[in-house]
Amino acid sequence: MILFLTSCSEVENTDTVVTNEVETDENESLESRAKRHVEASLTIPVNEKYSLKIYRANLDGDDREDAIITVNRYDFAIEEALKSNNTAKRAEVGYMGNYNYIFYYDGALNKISPPQVISSTPQAELTVKFDNITSQVYQDILIDYRIRNSSYKAIYSIRNHTPKRIFHWKNFDGLGTEQKEAYVLKFGEGTAGIQKDIYILKADFDNPESAEDLFTYSPDLRPTKEVLHHFFFVSSTDMYMTKK
């Protein structure tokens, strides 16, 4: 039996940025702390407009609420494009770059992690959902991000107080073209452990009829019954794999 690690047509797009830890005030709200931490970690000037959102859940199995903090720097992406010699080209590719970030707040430690950058198209902010995939005690993190007219889903699980990506796959591609493709993830009972198996179903969607922004438009995906791939969790690698 040959096992294959999960893969996607895109290159690895997540990196951790090493930063100095920001001093904390025990009585300060998470919203206020997150703002200070984000601005210090990413060296965001006071006059920059950016988006910061906080998504709360139990992500590591203790009795404290944790959180994922997302940051989108679309205005900064435009500013950098205007300063470059390739403004039109950057706009054409959707200002693709390092402008979407996630931070992890550990409720038990009461600390916010360094940022992880998710290279993507900044017109679309990251979308975050939670689900019990690798455990019934805590939830894992599902993040959707855009690369031009395509969309991808990454699944993270907390390891050593840090989000670790354990799976990723394409949601759709070719939006607005005849070469469109789409997939839907379905979770089922684990065959190799308590962690749920992942089934990739072929799906379809309708292209927008009007002049929608293809970098932000989210079509409704219609899954079929056709299973293209079946992944299961391998504890020794801490990743999802498939037989082939």
Q: Which residue stretches match the model-derived regions?
A:
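"Short basic amphipathic alpha-helical interaction patches in structured regions
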Residues: 70, 82-86, 144, 154-159
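Beta-propeller blade termini
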Residues: 51-59, 124-134, 138, 179-191
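Short coil/turn segments at the loop-to-beta-strand junctions that recur within blades
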Residues: 119-126, 170-175
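Alpha-helix initiation and capping sites
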Residues: 96, 135, 146-150
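Acidic, small-residue rich beta-repeat scaffolds with periodic aromatic anchors
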Residues: 2-49, 146-244
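Acidic/hydrophobic-patterned starts of short beta strands in beta-sheet-rich repeat architectures
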Residues: 59-71, 132-145, 191-201
